């Protein structure tokens, strides 16, 4: 029940923060879902982390705050983040899982979806770049948050 409550709070936080972007050169990145994926991977594990990513993507799409590309990216990133954290028991592994899962694998899976939705071919490198910029920034923020919580002995990790 505790994990469900934590995941639910993070879903609400993810929906609210999805309206916030950070300008990086000519682009705008949206790193907060990635931050939440890393934090949930460590705190609640893979099932609740992926469930929260899916729930956040659903709500963002229903509220017109996101795109269908959010599903594969966030869910793959959440799963790989939690998987690598469980395997290596290290916060850096969770951050790396989010970057690889969303930035690379999520972008590759989203490529045919993006082409279908746009009705014209899109450069794969464009998706990888945009997904990677957001996931690297979010994974770094999540890593820092988890390090601070850990150093203050406030982090209760998934067993």
Locate the predicted segments by residue.
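Loop-helix junctions at membrane interfaces
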Residues: 1-159
């Amino acid at each position: 029940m505790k994990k469900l409550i934590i995941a639910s709070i993070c879903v609400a936080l993810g929906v609210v923060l999805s309206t916030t972007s950070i300008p990086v050169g000519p682009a705008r990145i949206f790193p907060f879902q990635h931050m939440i994926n890393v934090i949930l991977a460590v705190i609640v594990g893979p099932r609740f982390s992926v469930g929260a990513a899916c729930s956040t993507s659903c709500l963002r799409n229903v509220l017109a705050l996101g795109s269908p590309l959010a599903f594969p990216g966030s869910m793959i990133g959440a799963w790989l983040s939690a998987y690598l954290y469980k395997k290596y028991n290290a916060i850096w592994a969770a951050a790396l899982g989010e970057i690889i899962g969303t930035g690379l694998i999520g972008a590759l899976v989203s490529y045919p979806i993006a082409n279908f939705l746009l009705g014209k071919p899109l450069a794969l490198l464009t998706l990888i770049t945009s997904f990677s910029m957001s996931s690297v920034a979010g994974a770094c923020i999540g890593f820092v948050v988890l390090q601070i919580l850990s150093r203050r002995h406030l982090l209760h990790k998934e067993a």
